[in-house]
Amino acid sequence: MSYTELESGYQDISQQHQQQNPHQSQPQQRVGFYLGLQDGNGDTDFGDSNDGMDSDTSTSSSNSKQVVVGICAMAKKTQSKPMKEILTRLGEFEFIKLVTFEENVILREPVQNWPTCDCLVSFHSKGFPLEKAIEYAQLRNPFVLNNLHMQYDIQDRRRVYAILEKEGIEIPRYAVLDRDSPDPKHHELIESEDHVEVNGITFNKPFVEKPVSAEDHNIYIYYPTSAGGGSQRLFRKIGSRSSVYSPESRVRKTGSFIYEDFMPTDGTDVKVYTVGPDYAHAEARKSPALDGKVERDSEGKEIRYPVILNHSEKLISRKVCLAFKQTVCGFDLLRANGKSYVCDVNGFSFVKNSNKYYDDCAKILGNMILRELTPTLHIPWSVPFQLDDPPIVPTTFGKMMELRCVVAVIRHGDRTPKQKMKVEVRHPKFFEIFEKYDGYKLGHVKLKRPKQLQEILDIARFLLSEIHTKAHAEIEEKESKLEQLKNVLEMYGHFSGINRKVQMKYQPKGRPRGSSSDDTNLAADQPVEPSLVLILKWGGELTPAGRIQAEELGRIFRCMYPGGQGRSDYSGTQGLGLLRLHSTFRHDLKIYASDEGRVQMTAAAFAKGLLALEGELTPILVQMVKSANTNGLLDNDCDSSKYQNLAKGRLHELMQNDREFSKEDRELINPCNSKSITQALDFVKNPVDCCHHVHLLIRELLHIISIKKDDPKTKDAILYHGETWDLMRCRWEKIEKDFSTKSKLFDISKIPDIYDCIKYDLQHNQHTLQYDQAEELYIYAKNLADIVIPQEYGLTPQEKLAIGQGICSPLLRKIKGDLQRNIDEVEDEFMNRLNPHYSHGVASPQRHVRTRLYFTSESHVHSLLTVLRYGGLLNVVTDEQWRRAMDYISMVSELNYMSQIVIMLYEDPTKDPTSEERFHVELHFSPGVNCCVQKNLPPGPGFRPHSHGDNACNVSLQSSDESNPARIEEENDSNSGEEREGKKRGTSGQRSTDRSAERISPAFGFNRLELRSKQFKSKPIPIGAHHTVSGHEAMDLAKRLNEELASHQQQQNQQLRPISPDIRAVTPDCEPRSRSFEQRPTSGVCAKEPDSQVSVSVSASVSSANASTSSRRQRHSIAGQMSYMKMLGFGGFSKKMATSANSLFSTAVISGSSSAPNLRDMITVSSSGFGDVPPIRPLETLHNALSLRKLDSFLQDMILAQIFKTPTGSPPRGFSKNTLPAVSSMTLTASNQTEVVEHEPISTTVTPTFDRRGSESGSTADAHLRLLSESQCPNLDDSNTELRESLAGKMELWPQDIVKAAEDEELNLSELETKPSLDLTMEIMERGVAGIASIQPMNRDSDETMGGGVFLSVCEEQGSGSTCLTPVSFGMDLDLSMVANKGSITLSMEGFDDDEDATLSAATTPSLLADCEPRLESCYCCPSHAEAPPEVPSDDPRFGFALPVRVTQASPEHARPVRRAHDPVSPRIQKQISLFEGNAAMATGQEKTESSGSVGGGAILHASINLPAAGPHHLRQDARLRKFENLTQSTSNSNFPFESNTLKRVPMQTTKDYDNVSHTQSCINLKSGSSGVLGGSPQRQRGSDGGGVGASGVPAESREPTRVHYGRMNSTCCSASASPSPSPGALIVKERFIEPPKRGVVRGYHGKTQSMDADFLFNEFLLLPAMAPAKISFDSSDIDQASDDDSPSSSKQRHA
């Protein structure tokens, strides 16, 4: 029987009784105090007492004996409101009579004169004579509610902790410093800068210092220097303060204290109030340690929030109540690290301001007293039914979706310019410091702590004094730098540990020289001694403006949570829902920040705004912000910096050409065709001229600074953030020197610094500086920076993706986990949140919202954006929302301060839990703060200034171009009331004014009516609508939007694009309807400005049977540019959609509305908001119809993806032959038009084999056939159905592994975008089964076969020799050990189990070695790239080609010669292996074999791989060897992977046993005439060697006719040096390739389909022989090129 049923029965009996005795029950109107009464809904209601039901005792005579309850406490307590409330309710019990002892009596009268009572409620407070109360209890022997003797213990924190420990209750680690003890061992204290040692126990800061007396509330918390130092001093509340921050960092020297670890509690404390062992009321309040500001409600009471305790906490509450023998007892809980700790026991105390608690408490106490005393006093009282706990009443969900998770990645706020100075030092004092901090172990030291910086400062002062007293040449040379070192270290008067750092690096042979500002007085021939390079870094601190931005953004963020716009329950502020959520533990908030001070302070300021905190940032930082560098989450020291440097090198070389950018230059600099970069290139024209102009402007600026510095009127002027004229001059002088190098070239890497500095000075110092050309310098620097900064993260999409994945893989993994945990959570564990009785305005009290905020620097924002943009999340062709989003991102020129990417996960509990519509994901992005200056716009079509949304901000554009009028305010579309509503705009500076006032200004220079008539309305896609937009709905939405756009395209073709204001209103009443792309001349603009958003898609492998669903799931890759959330407001949908996200986001971009920001013009706005704090642009919704499954699989692919490749997912193994899965291919962006053009065919070789997985091969063949027939030619019309049928007929001939390689290498094909004219067709040649050879796998009995190859070659129109572009390739350093190698592993990782805790550490991706520096060339011909570029709709003429496919029969003699596993190892491999083992001796003596035809002693691998001695053939498997070694190395997590018994050689049959497998690991392109990678001399490579097997594995007699053609198909691709002009498609850069970042093996979470054992690895990577064509069909045109084609035609082989 349930409690409810019992209660119901009990009530029925009582009511019948009342009806029988109406005369008795009528006069008694008192409330009955019983637990578990029922409300009208049939739910058990703990708190409803006024239900008209009387106490059972109503039948008794009112004259019978009563229980006398004596209240013995100080008057201040007995007269307090909570006590009065409870006593009033207790007095309503018929059998209870209350007697309150007067304070005078208690203090002055002997206990004999005190009133007598049956039950004593007595408790200690300041001034209370506890000993008299004990004496009274012994005299009268009443029933004592709270044990009096134990109240002595409660007054001593040492005893409290001892009792808690004895009961097994968790408490913080602590130690007692007892200065009163005679034993010196009890008061040993050693204090250091960042820790104290108490009686031998060390406490690192932050720690807590508590007086041993519980009556002393002066508790101090000490902070570490890394967070700014100082301490927070807590005290009993005085007014609205409960603590204050103090800069004092030293502990107190008098008195006895308890020292304990500080527990990070996310800023809230839980206060628990027991009433007996079975009842506990808990509430949360803001921790006094956070900011010391007491939150009070409108009545001035401290705001507290009810909390539901979890099971373990209820047990703690019971234990505390019983251990201290206090029926009524309060104690403090800290929830930290997943546990609950008791940190204080307060004894008798009541909850304030909770009527519900007063009811409960009086009921429980009354019943407890009566139950105890009525039997002895013979009172006829029957015990009512009781419930231990109030039941949980879940609220109904309704139609709104429930927000479950918010993940945001946010860049830090406005900062001072970062500055750096290097100086070479040799003084012994520096070496002493270096040694002291273990510099010789690592080769470098980082000094950040105040004490360390003080030591460096002391040395600098000492050396400077030495210089002045006695000249010393070595020191003198550095005087200016030492002076600067001293000035910087003395700058703020104190060291806080977050704004300066010194690094020292050991240079055994002195320091290599760099730019002109380096100290370079040493002669070149001077003998060099070891030295230290001292690098001083300062600046880069968060400015006050940055703090305001972050705080305001935090405040805005509140509004996206449930109840954010609802009624104001407590403080009347916006975003209240979040504050309640947080304080009631329904908000699971974690804030991570990388370790830079500016990032941490941004995070703290954001938390301050988000949670409405006050006070200093240091305490908030310590409690709320977790450092993400402990787990490498936001670490910047990742390997991809090496590859970034190589990309930078290529970019910088391209920017050194002293000529206007040619078409080729543009294609090389901006292969992704980003609109913002195109725009900047148009402005810059000649990069050298532009740099020269910038240099001149900087010199002028320096001249002005020197004048102002000496001018008596201005020399004392205070610059922003306390900077002096001297410091400003030093800053600009260093930039000026560094920018212009000794060779008279410009150092392009300084452009970001120049832009940084001028942006800072223009925003903060222009009023003092008054430099007339500041804006001009800003504009030039910005345009240069718009090219340099984004392209330093890679030029091509593949480079960008590779570098991006290298930087943000750990973060992606964490985000994936954040989203996943919401689905998997166990309900029981989360029952510790909001009491449902208080859940007004919150969707469901038992659930919680997970918020994860990651604050980081620009690199992570860029990387995450790149991964979203190019990783293949959605398809720009089929997904209209995504196309618009990508367009928008392409226009974003800069990821400014406070840029954000936000992912929001919603759940619809009404949907089936397994349905894809259950969880719904939205993706938002903001480019951060606005630029700080209005600037001229380059003339040209499509540019139109936009409004700031505020008439007062109207600024005229200084533009001579008539089509560039002054700023045009937002159009007022008077046709629609809804639209008028949507035009409300506000700025941050106007938050206090009426934001809903419309600000419409007249048009300037435009016929507004004409514009309006051309406008059309598209319904915005509402965010947070009443149902999930997913499945077919998303497709319909996109289709509808498309049709609307299409219907208006023609008339808008010539029209200029309007731009929305960057500001949107914050108020929930203002829902601006934004219409960004409505007036966009979609087809026209696209045609003029092709933007190849090349997104390399991850194939979703879903059944094509459900066409619409599958196409939806395969939408293309995310362009997620991180941007600032506009602090000021956001817009986007009608009021009937009002949900938690209401008015927070703009859906302008995806809904195709006219107010979407058009960032192409890079317009900046005048400062608005807080003085000179520019406002933040709104979060634009990139997509609001994503399914969680889609996003999850995308993140999984990105985490597992091999660098440089798009992670193409493979089709699921084992579906039947008649289901052909649709596999999405790489899609080059964009438009709805496709040209299909016939061209001459190119030849393709397909070698079918049996798949070694047996029966699976047929089904996967279907998939791959479809891959080649459909994804490569998606737009072939019906005339090509014959082709498809003929392909279908051959599907059995397609081996899984071949096309797997094709899928894996898909990404390289995207490079086709680099040249407009490519003739591509495909000819598929079959082979008979006769040509199939087999492989003997290790430890297998059966012969299973594997092999085959798919090749493409490209025939260019000019016939200038083939080209090969490996977009991001491998570093060729011979001295790089394998451990350090980062190549690209091509194993598809889908089959491995996911290990959530796996770390991305082990190197799995080796580099390939070469004898020479390769050129970067363009390759569509390598076997591994076994696919032609896909046919996609595109408005870019470069992609307007068709790909006819011709199937021809190949004869069996095309079988290729085979390489056996026991063939000799090439010397290159040998060298690599010996390097890996650190055994240099092994490498010697191998070199000579390269010039002969065979390898002699190169067969040694590692002792544990038992390969036979040299044979007649070359083992061309180094790629797989290294891949295999590194893979096993990473899977075993050991330095060297092999156990000698793991891999045993099985004797092989003959060479004919294998088929050659020809898949390049990467196209390594070698210079002409150099020795081949795979062990052949140049002569042999050119075919001059008479016998044996050539480098390509072709018999000598057949080599000559085939080499030319195959050179393009299989080789390292004829280099550009062989022909005078680069071939179309070639990207020729002389730098070496970019190495990919190190990747670890991460296991997939799908079913385990392949065991990752040694056999599998060995077979998969090591024993698959390389393959080359014996005879290949070729055109006569190929032979013509034979004489030109002089480069080696061997390619590193690998099996995908």
Swiss-Prot record:
Result of altering residue 1117 to G: In RNA edited version
GO CC annotation, single: cytosol
A GO term, aspect molecular function: inositol-1,3,4,5,6-pentakisphosphate kinase activity
Cross-referenced Pfam families: His_Phos_2, PPIP5K2_N
InterPro entries in the record: Acid_Pase_AS (IPR033379), His_Pase_clade-2 (IPR000560), His_Pase_VIP1 (IPR037446), His_PPase_superfam (IPR029033), VIP1_N (IPR040557)
Record's compositionally biased regions (Acidic residues): 45-54, 1677-1687
UniProt record, GO biological process: inositol metabolic process; inositol phosphate biosynthetic process
Superkingdom per UniProt: Eukaryota
Sites where the protein binds substrate: 76-77, 236-237, 271, 285, 349-352
E.C. designation(s): 2.7.4.24
Region spans: Disordered: 1-31, 43-62, 503-523, 942-1001, 1069-1091, 1233-1260, 1567-1600, 1676-1696
SUPFAM superfamilies per record: Phosphoglycerate mutase-like
Stretches with biased composition (Low complexity): 14-29
Binding site for ATP: 157, 210, 217, 236, 260-263, 269-271, 287, 332, 344-346
Recorded catalytic activity of this chain's protein: 1D-myo-inositol hexakisphosphate + ATP = 1-diphospho-1D-myo-inositol 2,3,4,5,6-pentakisphosphate + ADP; 5-diphospho-1D-myo-inositol 1,2,3,4,6-pentakisphosphate + ATP + H(+) = 1,5-bis(diphospho)-1D-myo-inositol 2,3,4,6-tetrakisphosphate + ADP
UniProt keyword list: ATP-binding, Cytoplasm, Kinase, Nucleotide-binding, Phosphoprotein, Transferase
Entry's family note: Belongs to the histidine acid phosphatase family. VIP1 subfamily.
UniProt-recorded name of the protein: Inositol hexakisphosphate and diphosphoinositol-pentakisphosphate kinase
